[in-house]
From Swiss-Prot:
It is an enzyme of class 2 (transferase). It comes from Methanosarcina mazei (strain ATCC BAA-159 / DSM 3647 / Goe1 / Go1 / JCM 11833 / OCM 88). Its EC number is 2.1.1.245. GO terms for molecular function: 4 iron, 4 sulfur cluster binding; iron ion binding; methyltransferase activity. This is Acetyl-CoA decarbonylase/synthase complex subunit gamma 2. The keyword Lyase does not apply. [4Fe-4S] cluster binds at residues 18, 21, 26, 43.
Length: 470
């Protein structure tokens, strides 16, 4: 994105404040364009009226991310990769979390293919209020047989809505897979110095994204990308090679940095998403599968942190997948807006009028930790999330985001009446907010009980202190 101010975007808008975009003014709409919550297509006059055509074209150029965004697959589970504007998250944010594709091979039994595909599709890990999922299936042509590969591709797409990558350096094999996957917008892997012409023709014929590959050869990689772009292929992914150990790993890491830095700094010929292949850990001569899986996770972590937009992985063991999806979720959290839950009164279990009332902040990690500690120990209660702008208890209490007035306001907005909805007229507050006890008692005219410093101690605390003494 070559502009970062709503004022700069505003110059290219109709400036009529018609409201057709859903915003009250064109300046408000310009703000949505800058933070990427809105698109130029949301402005009907800009799209429909010919007099704005030049402004629209220029605005689209200015708003385009420095790294091209590429879409793989179709429908709700389509995977968007790339689309970044910065090298460091704190300067804006990272967009389009690293996508993780897990492999199947066409020489596996059909039943084994189906089982693995369903395992990939059904993977779900609840974390801080959302489900973390896997993103797609990479189908490897281990047999190098077009017919066998086509059968495997057919079996995969019959059993999942996830996007797929067709993996082979043999154009005939890729063509067989493309025939089966028509309309699914698969990613082709890959074009190299030997097959680039044939694979490029396939990408154009079937209108699908394609990977260009040159192992540890950035000049060759750039040449391939430039050649494909000049041929009219827009959706390109870069594979500089992923060496799993030693100097090769160091070179791989350096190549990722060079590619992304060049793209962000304006070299459009190489400003494309980057593919990492942590599954090369299984080719590093590590005999023990647990150790190989561990090293694959290490590689995944390295390239999640440093510019890997899409990854090919193998191990489906929980000890491998959990850290991979957790790290990606953490790195791609938007620093401009802390992860928060709605500020309201929540029921934990099946609370009654005799159940305890507690509050915490609306920082998602804090809320779900407290809620989990209560629910897992069978404590039925009322739990209020106070709006602290997504800040945890200790920091919010110290910084003024958590005050007695904020707590009172949260109770009032929730519609929960401590005098009529419960029989005990008591509130349990976090131990880290003990300093607020007196103020809350004065503001709410209730009995305030100071809970433990850590929500993990709530079960023991409840046994000793609940119900409150009259």
């Amino acid at each position: 994105m070559k502009i970062n101010s709503p004022l700069e975007a505003y110059k290219y808008l109709p400036q009529t404040n018609c409201g057709e975009c859903g915003q009250p003014t064109c300046m408000a709409f310009a703000s949505t364009l800058i933070d990427r919550s809105g698109k130029t297509t949301d402005c009907p006059p800009l799209i429909k009226e010919k007099k704005f055509a030049k402004k629209l074209a220029e605005l689209d150029r200015l708003l385009a991310p420095e790294i091209r965004q590429v879409t793989i697959g179709v429908g709700e589970r389509a995977a968007n990769i790339g689309g970044d504007d910065v090298l460091y998250r704190h300067k804006l944010t990272f967009f389009n979390k690293t996508k993780m594709f897990f492999d199947v091979a066409d020489n596996m039994d059909e039943a084994a293919i189906v089982e693995r595909v369903k395992k990939i599709s059904d993977y779900k890990k609840f974390y801080v209020g959302r489900n973390l999922l896997l993103d797609g299936v990479a189908i490897r042509a281990a047999s190098n047989d077009p017919a066998k590969f086509a059968t495997a591709v057919k079996k995969v797409i019959e059993n999942t809505e996830l996007p797929v990558i067709l993996c082979s350096f043999n154009p005939a094999v890729l063509k067989a897979g493309l025939e089966v996957a028509k309309g699914k917008n698969p990613l082709l892997y890959a074009a190299n110095k030997d097959n680039w012409k044939e694979v490029g023709e396939l990408a154009l014929e079937y209108n699908v994204p394609v990977v260009v590959s040159a192992f540890n050869d950035l000049d060759g990689l750039k040449t391939l990308a430039k050649t494909f772009a000049e041929a009219g292929i827009k959706d390109i992914v870069l594979d500089p090679g992923t060496y799993p150990t030693g100097k090769g790993l160091k070179d791989t890491f350096t190549n990722f940095l060079k590619i992304r830095r060049a793209g962000i700094m304006g070299d459009t010929e190489i400003a494309y998403p980057i593919m990492a292949m942590p599954l090369t850990a299984w080719m590093a001569g590590i005999a023990d599968p647990v150790s190989a899986s561990y090293w694959e996770t290490v590689l995944s972590s390295i390239f999640t942190i440093r510019y890997g937009d899409i990854m090919l992985l193998h191990s489906m063991e929980p000890y491998a997948t959990m850290p991979e999806v957790h790290l990606a979720e953490t790195i791609y959290t938007d620093p401009r807006s802390p992860v928060a839950v709605d500020s309201k009164m929540y029921k934990v279990g099946n609370p009654t009028a005799d159940s305890p009332v507690l509050f915490t902040t609306n920082f998602a990690l804090t809320y779900y930790t407290v809620e989990s500690d209560l629910a897992s120990n069978g404590i039925d209660c009322w739990l209020l999330a106070v709006n602290t702008d997504g800040i945890g208890v200790e920091a919010a209490a110290a910084g003024g985001q958590l005050t007695a007035d904020k707590v009172k306001d949260a109770f009032e907005k929730s519609g929960f009446d401590l005098k009529s909805d419960v029989t005990h007229n008591s509130v349990v507050i976090p131990g880290l907010a003990a300093r607020l006890q007196g103020d809350i008692e004065d503001k709410l005219n209730v009995k305030v009980m100071v809970g433990p410093m850590d929500s993990g101690r709530l079960p023991g605390w409840m046994e000793k202190n609940w119900p409150p003494k009259k």
